[in-house]
């Protein structure tokens, strides 16, 4: 069975820089967000579940899900958020487990990019976990710039998630992305070669 490494981070922490680099190096990277996106396409498992739960109002004219509306329905209501975490979470876990088992047959090392890796107890799946970390003020600034948000909105969305500080204590390796892309990639190369990344505090 192959070595499995979990990669996680936070909004705008720079996780995609790491996963894109790994793919360029020829590694297989399972993208949990892409798996969810696929499951939410018309007719697929999450699509059916969500329409059954929220009704026709979440379907656009072209048959796709109205993702912004869905996000606001789920994130504005703690009960809906809990429902989503449990029900969608179970289906997502099944799909990711199937992909993991499939790749473990053929790959010596592969990666799984899971945004809620620690929050949803995926840690036990992995031989190592890598956290892409940035300081909070850098994260807010990058998030505002990336999604054209006000500081207030960016702060409130980040507040709804576990902080990167909290995740830092749980990860086996921390990739510091407060600097440039090249500095981040250099840390990834070091880990691939078997060294540690930046020093853990």
Features from the language model and the residues they span:
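An amphipathic alpha-helix signature
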Residues: 47, 51, 136-141, 151, ...
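ATP-dependent NMP and nucleoside kinases share a basic, alpha-helical "lid"
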Residues: 97-104, 109-145
């Amino acid at each position: 069975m192959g070595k499995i490494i979990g990669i996680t981070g936070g909004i705008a922490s720079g996780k995609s820089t790491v996963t894109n680099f790994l793919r360029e190096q020829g590694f297989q990277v399972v993208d949990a967000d892409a798996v969810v996106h696929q499951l939410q396409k018309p007719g697929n498992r999450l699509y059916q579940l969500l329409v059954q739960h929220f009704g026709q109002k979440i379907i656009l004219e072209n048959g796709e899900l109205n993702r912004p509306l869905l996000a606001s329905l789920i994130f504005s209501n703690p009960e809906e958020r809990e429902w989503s975490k449990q029900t969608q979470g179970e289906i997502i876990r099944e799909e990711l487990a199937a992909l993991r088992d499939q790749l473990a047959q053929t790959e010596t090392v592969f990666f799984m990019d899971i945004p809620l890796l620690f929050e949803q107890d995926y840690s036990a799946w992995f031989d190592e976990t890598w956290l892409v970390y940035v300081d909070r003020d850098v994260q807010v600034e990058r998030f505002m710039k990336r999604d054209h948000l006000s500081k207030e909105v960016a702060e409130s969305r980040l507040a709804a998630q576990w902080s990167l500080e909290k995740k830092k204590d749980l990860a086996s390796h921390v990739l510091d992305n407060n600097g440039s892309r090249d500095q981040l990639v250099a840390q990834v190369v070091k880990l691939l070669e078997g060294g540690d990344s930046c020093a853990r505090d």
